[in-house]
Amino acid sequence: MRFDILTLFPAMFQGPLTESILKRAQQAGKITIHLHDIRDWATDRHRTVDDAPYGGGAGMVMKAEPLAAAIRAVQAADEPGGPVVLLTPDGELFNQSIARELATLPRLILVCGHYEGIDERVRERLVDREISIGDYVLTGGELAAMVVVDAVARLVPGVIDSESIVEESHSDFLLEYPHYTRPAVWEGLAVPSILLSGHHGEIARWRRSERLRRTLARRPDLLARAAAAGVLTKADLALLAEWGWDGMSEGGWMS
């Protein structure tokens, strides 16, 4: 899979995109990441990419001409096509389902907004999708782009073990079960005995119940989504009912 990132600050990406899983994925040829400095498409000697907003107001706005030229040049590269995604606080909220969807694509073009945003006409003409990583404001879209690349890349086949993906938090709307490693006792705290039993069936059942318990305690809103998606078994529902879950989400009764 190919990631193209259009940004005013390409140096911000050098550390996060060249370490750990992303580094190994690139070395293995599973993904490629290409950084593009939007200033390279500015036409004046000062490489101007922003200007004051029409109508007045605080801050600056990213100009249409250099940004549009950058997007079109990247789209014209001799590679498979891909959607243009703008990272912006007013986009749809990014989640694991969107990450899975994007991971099926051969290419993704990410545009990092900055200042007060980009000229609206570029959004109307060239942007296919808008994504936000949360209900807060960052200095620019660079950090959001890093989050999207990391979340999507790990779902590309061959990047990480498929079993690890299945058991991760949010893979089926449930949070992940607790993890333990050696030593068996640390500062008086012992690893649950079931994990030392070698009984794989019992361990699997314990892990499932812990996923349900943790989700109920920390993110009960996810349980209604899990039930609606059909990922909760009768045994799951019985256990949740025993713990007091009544099928309600944050917005009311589960539909």
Curated annotation (Swiss-Prot):
InterPro entries, A to Z: Alpha/beta_knot_MTases, tRNA_m1G_MeTrfase_C_sf, tRNA_m1G_MeTrfase_TrmD, tRNA_m1G_MTases_N, tRNA_MeTrfase_TRMD/TRM10
Predominant location category: cytoplasm
Record-level GO BP terms: tRNA N1-guanine methylation
Binding site for S-adenosyl-L-methionine: G113, I133, G134, D135, Y136, V137, L138
EC nos: 2.1.1.228
Transmembrane segments: none
Gene Ontology molecular function, alphabetical: tRNA (guanine(37)-N1)-methyltransferase activity
Location in the cell: Cytoplasm
Pfam families attached to this UniProt entry: tRNA_m1G_MT
One cellular component term from this protein's GO annotations in UniProt: cytosol
Catalytic activity as recorded in UniProt: guanosine(37) in tRNA + S-adenosyl-L-methionine = N(1)-methylguanosine(37) in tRNA + S-adenosyl-L-homocysteine + H(+)
SUPFAM superfamilies per record: alpha/beta knot
Keywords: Cytoplasm, Methyltransferase, S-adenosyl-L-methionine, Transferase, tRNA processing
Keyword Signal on entry: no
Family: Belongs to the RNA methyltransferase TrmD family.
NCBIfam families noted in UniProt: PRK00026.1, trmD
Function (record text): Specifically methylates guanosine-37 in various tRNAs.
Binding partners and assembly: Homodimer.
Name by which UniProt lists this protein: tRNA (guanine-N(1)-)-methyltransferase
